[in-house]
Amino acid sequence: MKKWLAAALLAVGMGHAVSASAQEVTLALPTTSLVFLPNYVAADRGFWQKRGLEVKSPIISGAGSSNAVLSGGADFTTIGPGSTLRLIARGQKLSIIGTTVDRFLLEFVLRKDVAAKLPVKPDADLAARVRALKGISFGVDSINGYSHSFLRYLTGRYGLDAERDVVVSPVQPGSLVPSLAAKRIDGFIYGQPWSLQAVNDADGVIWISGVAGDVPELAPFAYMITIAKPETCQQRRAVCEKLMAGLQDALDFIHADPEGTFEVLRRKLPQMDQGLLRQALSVVRPAIPRSTETKVEAIEKAQEFGLIGGMMAADEQVKDWRIYIDNSFVRR
């Protein structure tokens, strides 16, 4: 592995040269976020270019990136499983060809003064921490999105009603920490780097952490998957092989070179405080798998989350996910 990685780094260090015959493909992303770290590394380090792929990654918000794949506006997307599983359950033809984050990353953050008044401490068992949230006001990035569904998932499992027992307001991610600091909300549900920023700058307390393994039944969890229409990889198999090989190179690089990975993020997110970015990377990096292989269990966990969290209807449950997972592009 070390010899292979050294050779790969040498190759991409020589100007990221692209041949005149490079194939252009579009891999849409739904937003800019740390969870797309493998995609950023593959692009920045030239892992796709050295294979003759020119990968364009336009931002197409939310589920729009999945719809772009279906309509032919994009060849691929890397996205959370929610909209994809729902589309497949509703009969849309999509293949899951890889996983690049396999740990659930969302966290509940409370203001320190709010947490201090609750009847339990942050180290109490999960059920007690969830039940203590009755009456708390939360900010989420979108109603019916992943953060809201995480609230519904946990309250549904531990005896609260997310629609009656807590207050939920939509808050843009960039406004979550300021809203917490201004005491407009008691807490929020989101991921890195905002949860860390709340702890650092707004007297926040991590109350429940998917990153730290507080919800073990959600592991493994296919948190970021890459999808395509089946015919894309049937008709252009070499393109799918090259795309996933580049993402595998990125996984290897992330685990082998933490400092180099930080430099990629620093270039991608120059506006972010470097200390916070480094902290956030230390949290996200362990959630990056060693292989792009998609585990059936990880998709089943994502489906269960969607069913309990209200992202999927009960009659949309898929019984066998194996027919929708294509691991033939995984480097063995």
Ranges and model annotations:
Residues 50, 115-121, 213-219, 285-295:
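Short, solvent-exposed loop/beta-turn-alpha elements that line the ligand-binding surface or hinge
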Residues 23-161, 167-170, 186-192, 220:
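Short, glycine-/small- and polar/acidic-enriched structural segments
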Residues 60-63, 78, 141, 145-146, ...:
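Soluble non-cytosolic domains of exported or imported proteins
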Residues 174-267:
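Pocket-lining segment of extracytoplasmic ligand-binding domains
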Residues 1-6:
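Bacterial N-terminal signal peptides that target proteins for export
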Residues 14-19:
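N-terminal signal peptide c-region/cleavage motif recognized by signal peptidases
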Residues 304-332:
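Conserved C-terminal helix/tail region of periplasmic/extracytoplasmic solute-binding proteins
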Residues 234-313:
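Secondary-structure end/capping motifs
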